[in-house]
Regions:
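Short S/T/G/P-rich N-terminal loop/turn motif that feeds into the first structured element of a domain
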Residues: 1-161
Length: 161
């Protein structure tokens, strides 16, 4: 796979801001779009439990971790606390935590995403957290509880509407 499409919307409010398309417009859109798709991957669905909006022009790369926390409530509390405690590091970055409720990738129940400037930018962010937020990071790892790391990967945001 070379590209992913991600639709994000408020639960029970998935319509378009401009209003719904007519059926023929929707059919035309997907017909044209499908001409550019060689094969479709699997679809997944879940909920956003925590979200900080960011500038995807400044930080166009997202590092995504697929995880299974033993205690999702404790994980969310620890996640929200580290984002607040290290707000200088996370400023203008998309930072999110959510669930996989349908079609969990490799059994992962949750995901985390952090925006960055590419591979080197993400590594520098981790170094900054370790060097300058040691206590906050230690608290995060203690308070989040046991977490199974399933996989992680980086994606580039090419367009956002």
């Amino acid at each position: 796979r070379t590209h992913r499409l991600v639709w994000i919307w408020e639960l029970n409010n998935g319509g378009r801001v401009e209003g719904d398309m007519q059926e023929f417009e929707n059919d035309a859109f997907w017909g044209q779009f499908s001409n550019h798709v060689e094969s479709w991957g699997t679809a997944k669905a879940g909920r956003i439990m925590s979200w900080q909006e960011g500038d995807v022009k400044e930080f166009p790369w997202g590092h995504i971790w697929d995880i299974s926390p033993k205690d999702p409530v404790a994980f969310k509390k620890a996640h929200d606390k580290i984002v607040k405690s290290a707000s200088d590091v996370f400023k203008n970055r998309v930072v999110g935590f959510g669930t996989y409720d349908i079609n969990r990738p490799n059994g992962a129940s949750h995901w985390v995403v952090i925006g960055g400037t590419g591979l080197n930018g993400h590594l520098n962010m981790h170094q900054d957290l370790e060097d300058n937020y040691t206590k906050a990071m230690n608290d995060y790892f203690i308070n989040r509880g046991e977490v199974e790391h399933v996989q992680d990967f980086i994606v580039e945001v090419l367009a956002r509407y």
